[in-house]
Amino acid sequence: MAALVCAELEQPSNSVAEIQSVLSAQQTAWNRGDIDAFMNGYARSTSTVFVSEDEARRGWETVRDRYRVKYSDRAKMGTLGFSEIEVTMLSSDAAVVLGRWKLKRENDEPHGRFTLIFKRLPEGWRIVHDHTSAASSQ
């Protein structure tokens, strides 16, 4: 019984570390210009949702295509940084993540906030819903 209780207590911290690892891998992939590897953090599903700029895009391929168009070269991609990451476990297989993003580019530094819903899938923790907003440029 004690082993079962310990395993249950350890799971949330393991899950948080696994989710943080997904975000770290995404940041690394982005910063080497690899959008396809960045997209490995998202669930490869038609139900994956990305919300930004007053538009909801549905489906992993649609989200990937949006990134490819918007960030078509390394100059547009810049260097990505995440900060103020807060992971809240909703259940043993779901979590919400709140954080900040920032791109450092030659002529600007767009930044904003994001809320992600992660789900534990057979292939590991993946983003199933991403709501990202940019701060005003003022």
Where is each model-derived feature located?
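Short, low-complexity N-terminal intrinsically disordered segments enriched in polar/charged residues
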Residues: M1-G41, S45, T62, Q138
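Short, well-ordered beta-strand segments in beta-rich or mixed alpha/beta enzyme
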Residues: Q26, T48-E53, A94-K104, I117
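A solvent-exposed, acidic/Ser-Thr-rich amphipathic alpha-helical stretch
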Residues: I35-L90, K102, D108-E109
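Hydrophobic residues on conserved beta-strands that form the core of alpha/beta folds
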Residues: F82-E84, L98, I127
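A short, structured loop/turn motif at beta-sheet edges
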Residues: V87-A95, F118-G124
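Short beta-strand edge/turn micro-motifs at domain boundaries
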Residues: H111-Q138
